[in-house]
Amino acid sequence: MLGRLLRTNSFIDLLGSFPNGKDDGKGPQPHHEATPPPSSMHMPDELRTLLYGCRKVEGEGRGGEGRGSGTFRLVVAQELGQMMSRDNYQVVLDCGGTRAAVGSGGAEMPLSELKEYIFGSPVRLSDRCRSDKLKLSRGARVIVVTRIFYTGYAGNARRLAVCCCIPEQFLTVVTECWSQVSAWFDEVQDVLMPLLEAEPLLPKDLRVSAPAQVDVLLHKFYRHLILPLHGLLETHRLFLYPADSLDFVTAWFREVFNWLEVKDGHRLKFLPALLGKLRHDAAAELLHNRSSRIVVMSGNVTVANKLIFILSAFLRPRYSGQVHYVDDGLAARNVELKEAPADPKYSSTITSKGWEIPRKRSRSSVLSKSSDETSFAHVFLPSSLRSTNSLQYISSSLNSQYGSYGSWFKKTIPLGHSPRINESPDNTFMHHHTNSTSSLQQQQAGTCASGNNASSVTTSTTPNTNRWSQGSPSISEYEEYPWLGYGTAPSGAPSKSRIQKVNMPRNSNRVHDKKLLHERFVSICGDVQEVDFHTSPATESYGAILEVPILEELSFPSQELLPRYSSYLPTLDPAFQVQACPITSNTERRLVDCMKQDLHNAEYSRTLLISLRSREIKEITITKDPSTKTIVQRTKKIFLNGKPGHVSQKLHEEIHFVDNHLTATWKKWEDPVESEDKTKLFITSFHELMK
């Protein structure tokens, strides 16, 4: 009974409901609630390094002064046809908006100067072509994006303009998603054109004369431009390590073996089915079609992020530049600055007897909080649920959950287990091999706990320092198996794990690789002596002409700009192809709505939907029938009820290959008699799996 009670308290109940963001066409509503914090705020350092290639992303944690601050401005203007008059241009709508609210005024640039940017020279052109232009104003620190168009009537030669002023920090995002910005201009133009059917000019004040159209414009301005640009700029994207990086390969096998042991068990083949699908066609589909996605639904942030890291090994394109590491000398100096204070109550925790459990009851009650609860500090559990002994009594009730392979509490490390202080996860993973099936979990738990022992000394006044006892797990862990992850407290001693020292210079969406940019520039603008150009001689009709060859098929894969692959997000973002999101009642419905919107620019939209609560994998494909113009939705079950669904023979062979390959590699790694180099084993096995 208690197990079912805990299972109903999901992750969403703790955080509250998320806005569904559905485009209902009812106009913009004032949005004053606080922006949800990024999911990476309370992420452990090592997990951040695995996902992002560094512990701290540039521009993170600046609050209102961050990269995404600033006001957007929407201006609609028209030409009156009085070329000799100073009042030839009339502004019919001028409003501003931010991510928190829309409809407020924004006067960062004078209208007189802005009208010059919009319409330019008064000299008229002979054609009536539509034009888009972009200008960066250094003085006002804004990007002026303008659409100039004409009405559909032949006798009306007056120009109309839709202008958007965007903060300059969005420049890289605007150039990346220019097609989406152009589509937004088309939507605004479609709203304004019906107003010109009766009159040759727009009303002087659109807010008074056409309030319904203004509401639609502001709604599209907020939903289709402001929010997508903020999401692309501020959401942290995955860093795809090079496939030949030994540190990445070692960490990847460590997470895979941990998942197979803790999450799948001996019967469930969930991970092999997922990796087999990625190897078969799902990973390549992301490159061929921008409307394809991989979405992981989960109530546990840590578990979802670890699964994202595992499946990221099959994603492309991978980074091919140099991987940067933290200087050992700098890391040592930072540790010295974080030494524990010389206080007796901080220095008496660890004794020669190892890790002890207090036998005497204290009169003062201490509210314990595990690392997994840091993001839910406002949730208070009863003291009975925060006690390890009390949790052990209800383990039999939790055992009856669907897909449970033994009690979660039996998987934890005993309280008397004494970890070694100077071991790191990678060192233990590479050098300790036993025949026990639970050896990997014990090594992982012990070594990760030892990596955080110094911080435990400085942050705890109780003798209980073995964090793997997990005395107070978060409620979401009852639904999905708990993951013995890494502590959120910063490590107090220099770690020997090589992957933890990776420090890629980057911001949320780009890698700062000057060497890579220099190579790209040299390849385009090479040495003048090597360019095959010549000068044709002058004649009586014309002078000498310099002829330079043009490379028409010059193409460079994007390496600085990271692909739109992200980790756990507070809500579904259709702009990202790979992401994880919470499980809500309308997540799948909203996903289908986003896929239907993709059909405006693509022939089909496909999503691989992964549910960690029910351990289901299904592929949703939405197409439009060319003859009837109706939308056709097909759903294919890849994995359900603990086994693969009705899949093709080729996919079934891929799943079987991945399962056998991972099992064989795991057995070789655990076999103490195996004399093969473990490093070479991982590299060879990884490249065979990625073929």
Swiss-Prot record:
Q: What is the lineage of its organism?
A: Eukaryota, Fungi, Dikarya, Ascomycota, Saccharomycotina
What are the record keywords, sorted? Amino-acid transport, Protein transport, Transport
Q: Which family does it belong to?
A: Belongs to the LST4 family.
Query: Which stretches make up the dDENN FNIP1/2-type domain?
Result: 607-687
Q: Name one GO molecular function term.
A: GTPase activator activity
In this chain the cDENN FNIP1/2-type domain maps to 251-601
Q: Name one Pfam family in it.
A: Longin_2
Listed GO CC annotations? FNIP-folliculin RagC/D GAP; vacuolar membrane
Gene encoding the protein = LST4
Q: Where is the uDENN FNIP1/2-type domain?
A: 67-243
Q: Where is the composition biased (Low complexity)?
A: 450-469
Query: Which terms under GO biological process does the entry name?
Result: amino acid transport; cellular response to amino acid stimulus; positive regulation of TORC1 signaling; protein transport
> What residue spans carry the Polar residues bias annotation?
435-449
Q: Which organism is it from?
A: Eremothecium gossypii (strain ATCC 10895 / CBS 109.51 / FGSC 9923 / NRRL Y-1056)
Q: Does the keyword Protein transport apply?
A: yes
Task: Provide the residue span(s) of the region labelled Disordered.
Answer: 17-44, 422-474
UniProt xrefs under InterPro entries: DENN_FNIP1/2, LST4_longin
Which protein are we looking at? Protein LST4
Biased composition (Basic and acidic residues) is annotated at 21-34
What is the role of the protein in this entry? Involved in extracellular amino acid uptake. Required for the protein trafficking from the Golgi to the plasma membrane.
